[in-house]
Amino acid sequence: MLSIHDPLLIFTDLDGTLLNSHTFEWQPAAPWLTRLHESGVPVILCSSKTAAEMLQLQTTLNLQGLPLIAENGAVIQLDVHWEDHPNYPRLIAGISHNEIRLVLHKLREKEQFKFTTFDDVDDQVISEWTGLNRAQSALTRLHEASVSLIWRDSDERMAQFVARLNDLGLQFVHGARFWHVLDASAGKDQAANWLIEAYRQQWRARPLTLGLGDGPNDAPLLDVMDYAVVVKGLNREGVHLRNDDPQRVYRSQNEGPDGWREGMDYFFSRS
């Protein structure tokens, strides 16, 4: 159904998809990453992580120079060859990290919502939360257009909190382990569509798209893909897509990078 020689873009989530959620291992996906790189197929990382974290991961995965989608779509790192773009090197959706911090501070002071943001703690605490080393934990704090937090209040209070955020033009997104507050105009799907259009103009043909993700917050991204791999994950809610046609969507039996490889094998062995 898909060919490595098609005009093709691969969009992939990180934690629980390309990376093992616990060990951060990615090696099972290495043969496919090498093959895609050698064929000139862009692999676009898409995550709640900061751009600083993801740029480091790009180097590890030999994907440096390609675009990436950070902070759940609030930040797009542009391709290194797009220097002439007016927003190079990064496109930011909506208000900044510091503006969101101020909103959250006021909400917490006024309405006593209980949560702990990454800005409230030091690198050591984040290291304990994430399992990352201190240097990597420091990169997780470099948000540009969102705030990550741990929710410590009731479900009822969360509903009130979400309503307040929505009134202020913000959204509350549940990631693999943390919650994220970002501008309502941002999203993995909007960021992916922006990049698809950028490549369409560059290639003078609309690229085929394949997305891979494991969590409910990946559904908007997978919904705008031509083909999708739902990698088996830990989230009990599962991933519900608008179009779950088995011709378009494959659900893996394996988790993490093993499931990532399984999904790639499935779509590229059917042609």
UniProtKB/Swiss-Prot annotation:
It comes from the Bacteria. GO terms for biological process: mannosylglycerate biosynthetic process. This is Mannosyl-3-phosphoglycerate phosphatase. InterPro entries: HAD-like_sf (IPR036412), HAD-SF-IIB-MPGP (IPR006381), HAD-SF_hydro_IIB (IPR006379), HAD_sf (IPR023214), MPG_Pase (IPR012815). GO terms for cellular component: cytosol. NCBIfam families: HAD-SF-IIB, HAD-SF-IIB-MPGP, MPGP_rel, PRK03669.1. Its EC number is 3.1.3.70. Keywords: Cytoplasm, Hydrolase, Magnesium, Metal-binding. It catalyses: 2-O-(alpha-D-mannosyl)-3-phosphoglycerate + H2O = (2R)-2-O-(alpha-D-mannosyl)-glycerate + phosphate. The active site is at D13 (nucleophile). One of its GO terms (molecular function) is magnesium ion binding. Mg(2+) binds at D13, D15, D214. It is found in: Cytoplasm.
